[in-house]
């Protein structure tokens, strides 16, 4: 029992010692990741119902993400637009770095059009507001540390054109 307590304490201390990377204590960091589709995101922001920026991000309620993008690939629509989400936590026994959070496939190969992406996604320069509802994954979210830095990788894949676009975001997240 004492060994378990010592290990748990070390994990907590190593996570706390790392702090918030890349300014995530005060702001959302995002970038466009690996992409084969002709889609370019120029803004990504977490917003409330009035369209005002919100930070930190709460994963205990639906997350509204306002984006601006230029889609030169083609129209994306159901059932061919798929979404995969990967989560990463910062810190832990491996030191101050990002490590994958196991989701056991629950966040893989989801129908993007029923999971918050307004479909069809038209061709052209446009604003696109997505609502990602993490509450349906409470079994995963409840295991995450509260008020901690997390990295979210959101990948949208189009099965018609066999292309994909990835958005990466690092944020201070609330899980309680």
Locations of the language-model features?
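Cleavable N-terminal signal peptides of Sec/SRP-targeted secreted and luminal proteins
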Residues: 1-16
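N-terminal onset of structured domains
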Residues: 13-117, 121-176
């Amino acid at each position: 029992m004492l060994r378990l307590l010592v290990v748990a304490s070390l994990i907590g201390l190593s996570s706390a010692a790392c702090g918030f990377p890349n300014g995530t204590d005060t702001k959302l960091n995002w970038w466009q990741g690996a992409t084969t589709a002709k889609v370019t995101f120029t803004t990504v922001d977490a917003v409330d119902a009035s369209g005002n920026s919100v930070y930190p991000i709460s994963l205990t309620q639906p997350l509204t993400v306002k984006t601006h993008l230029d889609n030169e690939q083609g129209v994306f629509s159901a059932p061919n637009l798929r979404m995969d989400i990967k989560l990463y936590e910062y810190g832990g026994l491996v030191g101050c770095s990002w490590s994958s959070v196991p989701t056991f496939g629950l966040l893989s190969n989801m129908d993007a059009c029923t999971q918050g992406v307004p479909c069809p996604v038209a061709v052209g320069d446009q604003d696109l507001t997505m609502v990602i509802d993490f509450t349906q994954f409470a079994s995963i979210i409840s295991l995450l540390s509260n008020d901690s830095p997390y990295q979210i990788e959101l990948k949208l894949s189009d099965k018609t054109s066999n292309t994909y676009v990835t958005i990466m975001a690092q944020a201070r997240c609330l899980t309680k």
